[in-house]
Curated annotation (Swiss-Prot):
<dbReference type="InterPro" id="IPR020581">
    <property type="entry name" value="GDC_P"/>
</dbReference>
<comment type="subunit">
    <text>The glycine cleavage system is composed of four proteins: P, T, L and H.</text>
</comment>
<protein>
    <recommendedName>
        <fullName>Glycine dehydrogenase (decarboxylating)</fullName>
        <ecNumber>1.4.4.2</ecNumber>
    </recommendedName>
</protein>
<dbReference type="GO" id="GO:0019464">
    <property type="term" value="P:glycine decarboxylation via glycine cleavage system"/>
</dbReference>
<dbReference type="Pfam" id="PF02347">
    <property type="entry name" value="GDC-P"/>
</dbReference>
<feature type="compositionally biased region" description="Polar residues">
    <location>
        <begin position="1"/>
        <end position="13"/>
    </location>
</feature>
<dbReference type="GO" id="GO:0005829">
    <property type="term" value="C:cytosol"/>
</dbReference>
<dbReference type="GO" id="GO:0016594">
    <property type="term" value="F:glycine binding"/>
</dbReference>
<feature type="modified residue" description="N6-(pyridoxal phosphate)lysine">
    <location>
        <position position="704"/>
    </location>
</feature>
<keyword id="KW-0663">Pyridoxal phosphate</keyword>
<dbReference type="Pfam" id="PF21478">
    <property type="entry name" value="GcvP2_C"/>
</dbReference>
<feature type="region of interest" description="Disordered">
    <location>
        <begin position="1"/>
        <end position="24"/>
    </location>
</feature>
<dbReference type="GO" id="GO:0005960">
    <property type="term" value="C:glycine cleavage complex"/>
</dbReference>
<dbReference type="GO" id="GO:0030170">
    <property type="term" value="F:pyridoxal phosphate binding"/>
</dbReference>
<dbReference type="InterPro" id="IPR049315">
    <property type="entry name" value="GDC-P_N"/>
</dbReference>
<dbReference type="InterPro" id="IPR015421">
    <property type="entry name" value="PyrdxlP-dep_Trfase_major"/>
</dbReference>
<dbReference type="InterPro" id="IPR003437">
    <property type="entry name" value="GcvP"/>
</dbReference>
Length: 954
């Protein structure tokens, strides 16, 4: 290629669009922080002993058009068939009003978890609707705001049963009619907690001495049976019973709660979320009110703001890993908020009557198929069903299965039986095609007429739902597309996302989620593939996964990857399991001590506890580094039982620890393994790797470094990379040929496969040079912010040359002593200036951790720094007595439009200062919709269901 052609190429355009500061602005920033060049800044920041000697061996950057063309080749290798496999995954129609206005809308998918409720009221309302939907359909008293998938929800339910129950047994019963993938994930969780799993016939449950039980309703083979007596008998034996159920079936069937279930779990996938080869989808958990504080996951509750107006928030956060650490109810952080919102809106759009019609149509099609097959001489395994039937096909099984495949139809093979599951997309033509496969001559119309006289004959009368559901006005208002569009926009407008401004959350990497990366996610070639379809139908997914894993190995210095974990916490869990299985394979299963620095994220100790490790905390020194002397003492004390150490790099204190290789060597010398948390991988890519540093295993947060959007609290992905000696211990899956114990951690082999194209696209469009440049710019942005703020705020940790990594910690503690203003006051005041707050009080209480990422431009960085400096000046006015401590712009923040419109203004500062505190806010203003939320009131007066419509009107 000539020099001119090269200069005109679009090949590297994306890098400049992804990174915020252009070359000219980068030079200004370097001058401002007294750095000669970007490379010299990196030399001053990143220890020489961990720097890579060679660049990564990755392909050159692709243009957006070339990337999409390459992605199309992957997609075209997938084959969309008529799929009737079921097993927890179903085709569904995503209402286009939801597809366009939520799934494809950065206002919804770029928001963060709603820890700052004043700027999150929209998605909090939607998630509250989700909880109400789940409670109504399951007949339970309280629900959470989503879990990762149905199988992990079942594993979480098992631990809830143990915590909440009174049985002294250590055995958990699983009915053999539970989905196979769920059974395997439950077995994994049980093994490492120390529970025994007993898989048996459902009717044997009352005889068992078990602390908990898991049953499926309808069963995996489709049978619908009354569980009421079985549940009562089990509960009489101190057994808590979890029912894995189906939300659409619950529109017609007696719900699990009315049969006495203690816990109900399942997946909301079929409520408008594509199968996507396994995910992401929102799982749900609902339980009795008395178990609410042992229920894992986020729970949305109703509270009030400082003016007494209704406000929503995340409730009961003291249960969660970021507070309780190794004593938490679960290690779950990121759940599936975006998918829960889609399912919630599906229920809002259709309403109770719409859902009932969809359920009736699905059931009627199934009843027609069952009647035709029966008349055609086939025997059904059971005659009570909702949407799934199992046919005893005997010696004909293989031939019929092959005949179906030849007709582009996927059935479920169950030994000498074939399973068929219908859904809302099933048509008369589908039924006729199945009749042709089975050689049935019956007419669909005639069968429909025959069934119409007793439409629900296949549902025993005692199991037909009689109670109402989705009666709240929100489910009975927005049924035209105009109404729905406006409701979605109304909620979106309440929330702060990357469409509004920088979200400088430390340790969260809220970088650009580029439109080109997102486009393939909605292609049907990725969305319409069943996770258990024959492998040749998912060849595109296999090729994409293989290439992505190779790229991730190159980026991390690892030898093998698993894409199965569907969150960062799940990746941690899979990584520690790999370590423990490795020790067991060497006859050292007694190694159970996990060393964790005091600065670690709360998931680390919570995850270690989930694999029955003993957590031993290692001190950090005054510079934020691991205290090597204390580490040596802890290693010496626990040498014989040392399993591993969990570290984060750069550390959660925002510095590159110079002795990190020494730390790894010390642990290895004592027979331990090194787990390097990949949360801060955005500061490593192209400069160093976990493998080069000396780590044995890491998870990567693809929703941080590799551009999968946070979705307002999920989805995420946490694939794990390992050195070769740990590769045999990566999670397997029954649907991928794993025999015996497979140690699955997710319901599907490839986890949340349909969002993998996002990360592949990012890597492809950045190329080696672009990825490395992004890391350097992230470090530049963080150091620029740090130097701008340092004259006004104490910076807690810096490296030996005075630099920080990709984030910095601002210490508010001495300023609070001096002025009385807290880190929370600053966080809330930033909303008035048009910003989401930095991370509060992590990893050090009383601090703010700022991570600007590489995607923020100089103008936005300056706007943030100007806001922080102005807030510091406001603090000084409080200190000097110009404003009282209990009545000033900081403690009254955030300010709303209602404040601006008040007839009386009893504050010692102007309306303008309160509501438009900067020049930038006068040209464009984001408005919080509620004042500061009262967290204490919300937990003392716990309401986790939709409040009366009167509350919204007030």
């Amino acid at each position: 290629m000539t020099e001119l052609l090269q200069s005109l190429s679009t090949q590297n355009e994306f890098v400049a669009r992804h990174n915020g500061p252009n070359k000219s602005d980068q030079q200004k920033m370097l001058e401002a922080i007294n750095a000669v060049s970007l490379d010299s800044l990196i030399d001053e920041t990143v220890p020489a002993q961990i720097r890579l000697e060679q660049p990564m061996n990755l392909a050159e950057a692709k243009s957006e058009a070339d990337m999409l063309a390459a992605m199309r080749k992957f997609a075209d290798q997938n084959q969309i068939k008529r799929t009737f496999i079921g097993q927890g995954y179903y085709n569904t129609f995503t209402p286009n009003v939801i597809l366009r206005n939520v799934m494809e809308n950065p206002g919804w998918y770029t928001a963060y978890t709603p820890y700052q409720p004043e700027i999150s009221q929209g998605r909090l309302e939607s998630l509250l609707n989700y909880q109400q939907m789940v409670m109504d359909l399951t007949g339970m008293e309280i629900a959470n705001a989503s879990l990762l998938d149905e199988a992990t929800a079942a594993a979480e339910a098992m631990t809830l049963c143990k915590r909440a129950g009174k049985s002294k047994s250590n055995v958990f019963f699983v009915a053999d009619d539970v989905h196979p993938q769920t059974i395997e994930v439950v077995k994994t969780r049980a093994k490492f907690i120390g529970f025994e799993v007993l898989v048996g016939a459902l009717d044997s449950l009352p005889e068992q001495d078990v602390f908990g039980a898991l049953v499926q309703y309808p069963g995996t083979t489709g049978e619908v049976r009354d569980l009421t007596d079985l549940i009562a008998k089990a509960q009489a034996n101190k057994t808590l019973v979890t029912v894995a159920t189906d939300l659409l079936a619950s529109a017609l069937l007696k719900p699990a709660g009315e049969m006495g279930a203690d816990v109900a779990i399942g997946s909301a996938q079929r409520f408008g979320v594509p199968m996507g080869y396994g995910g992401p989808h929102a799982a749900f958990m609902a339980t009795r009110d008395k178990h609410k504080r042992t229920m894992p996951g986020r729970v949305i509750g109703v509270s009030i703001d400082t003016n007494g107006n209704q406000a929503l928030r995340m409730a009961m956060q003291t249960r969660e890993q970021h507070i309780r650490r190794e004593k938490a109810t679960s290690n779950i952080c990121t759940a599936q908020a975006l998918l829960a919102n889609m399912a919630s809106f599906y229920a809002v759009f259709h309403g109770a009557e719409g859902l009932r019609t969809i359920a009736r149509r699905t059931h009627h099609m199934t009843a027609i198929l069952a009647a035709g097959l029966t008349k055609g001489g086939f025997e059904l395994a059971h005659n009570s069903f909702f949407d799934t039937i199992t046919i005893n096909t005997g010696a004909q099984t293989e031939d019929l299965y092959a005949k179906a495949l030849a007709a582009d139809i996927n059935l479920r093979k169950l030994g000498t039986q074939l399973g068929v599951s219908f859904d809302e997309t099933t048509t008369v033509a589908d039924v006729e095609a199945l009749f042709a496969v089975f050689g049935v001559k019956e007419e669909v119309a005639a069968l429909s007429t025959e069934i119409a006289g007793n439409e629900f004959a296949a549902i025993p009368e005692a199991l037909r739902r009689t109670t109402e559901y989705l009666t709240h006005p929100v489910f009975n208002t927005h049924h035209s597309e105009t109404q729905m569009m406006r409701y979605l926009k109304q909620l979106e407008n309440k929330d702060f996302s990357l469409t509004h401004g920088m979200i400088p959350l430390g340790s969260c990497t809220m970088k650009l989620n580029a439109a080109a990366e997102m486009i393939p996610v909605t292609w049907p070639e990725f969305g319409s593939i069943h996770p258990f379809a024959p492998a040749d139908q998912a060849a595109g997914y296999a090729a994409l996964a293989k290439d992505l894993k190779e790229k991730l190995c190159e980026i991390t210095g690892y030898d093998a990857f698993s894409l199965q974990p569907n969150s960062g916490a799940s990746g941690e869990y899979a990584g520690l399991i790999a370590i423990q299985r490795y020790h067991e394979s060497r006859g050292e299963g007694h190694r159970n001590v996990c060393l964790i620095p005091s600065s670690a994220h709360g998931t680390n100790p919570a995850t270690a506890s989930m694999v029955s490790m003993k957590v031993v905390v290692v001190k950090c020194d005054e510079e934020g580094n691991i205290d090597v002397t204390d580490l040596a003492a802890k290693i010496k004390k626990h040498k014989d039982n040392l399993s591993s150490i969990m570290i984060t790099y750069p550390s959660t204190h925002g510095v590159y620890e110079e002795q990190v290789k020494e730390v790894c060597e010390m642990v290895h010398a004592a027979g331990g393994q090194v787990y390097l948390d990949g949360a801060n991988m955005n500061a490593q890519v192209g400069l160093t790797t976990p493998g080069f540093i000396g780590s044995d295993v890491s998870h990567l947060n693809l929703h941080k470094t590799f551009c999968i959007p946070h979705g307002g609290g999920g989805p995420g992905m946490g694939p794990i990379g390992v050195k070769s000696h740990l590769a045999p211990f990566l999670p397997g899956h029954i649907e991928n040929g794993a025999d015996g114990e497979n140690f699955a951690v997710s319901a599907a082999d490839m986890g949340s496969a349909s969002i993998l194209p996002i990360s592949w696209a990012y890597i492809a469009m950045m190329g080696e040079a672009g990825l490395t440049d992004a890391t350097k710019v992230a470090i530049l942005n963080a150091n620029y912010v740090m130097e701008q703020l340092r004259p006004h705020y104490p910076v807690l940790y810096r490296g030996s040359n005075g630099r920080v990594a990709h984030e910095c910690i601002i210490d508010i503690r001495p300023l609070k002593e001096e002025t009385g203003i807290s880190e929370e006051d600053i966080a809330k005041r930033l909303m008035d200036y048009g910003f989401h707050a930095p991370t509060m009080s992590f990893p050090v209480a009383g601090t703010l951790m700022v991570e600007p990422t590489e995607s923020e431009d100089l103008e936005e960085l300056d706007r943030f720094c100007d806001a922080m400096i102005a807030i510091r000046e406001e603090m000084t006015k409080v200190k000097n007595g110009e404003w009282p401590l209990d009545n000033n712009p900081l403690v009254n923040a955030p300010h709303t439009q209602f404040d601006l419109a008040k007839e009386e203004w009893d504050r010692p500062y102007s309306r303008e200062l309160g509501c438009f505190p900067s020049k930038a806010t006068k040209s464009w203003k984001y408005w919080p919709t509620v004042n500061r939320v009262d967290n204490v009131y919300g937990d003392r007066n716990l309401i986790c269901s939709c409040p009366s419509i009167d509350n919204y009107e007030d």
